[in-house]
């Protein structure tokens, strides 16, 4: 009986677990939103940065490449740093990368900002699921993981639409400032 009750408790007792995981959900949403949002701004960005499509593709490839490198390392990072420090670093990296890209005066600067965004996104994604497993009881994890997956899948679905609205009233720079 005691074993069953232990299985129904979260490993870390948090009074409001949904409130605790909300910043990570927002960070993951924005990370995925940023993945698809630049597609709509392609013509404006290519013209403003004076680059061709093959060079411009690096804004997507660089972002995804960095995420692909950081994701497997995130487990190692949790052994070296506290979860709080990793969350703060991940969110800060994404914000700093967004600002660098938004203020970018040339293609290299925008690309560097995108890659820094990738660092933040690569840290936040796995942390969101790890923290959920710690602060929610096991019997709630199915629901929690479903909601987290919904957040991640919803962002790229609405990314192009929101970007179109942003571009209708602003410039490509505003896309990056929206992430902040």
Where are these regions (language model features)?
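Signature tryptophan residues that serve as conserved aromatic anchors
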Residues: 18, 58, 172-174
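Recurrent gating helices in multi-pass secondary carriers
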Residues: 20, 28-39, 67, 156
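Membrane-interfacial loop-to-transmembrane-helix junctions in polytopic alpha-helical membrane proteins
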Residues: 12, 16, 52, 109-112, ...
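Membrane-interface helix caps of multi-pass secondary transporters
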Residues: 29, 34-52, 73, 77, ...
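Cytosolic juxtamembrane N-terminal segment immediately preceding the first transmembrane helix
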Residues: 1-33, 47
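Extracellular/periplasmic helix-loop-helix junction of adjacent transmembrane segments
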Residues: 41-70, 107-112
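Residue-level signal for short hydrophobic patches within transmembrane helices
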Residues: 18-30, 62, 89, 96, ...
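Helix-loop-helix hairpins in multi-pass membrane proteins, especially solute transporters
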Residues: 71, 75-180
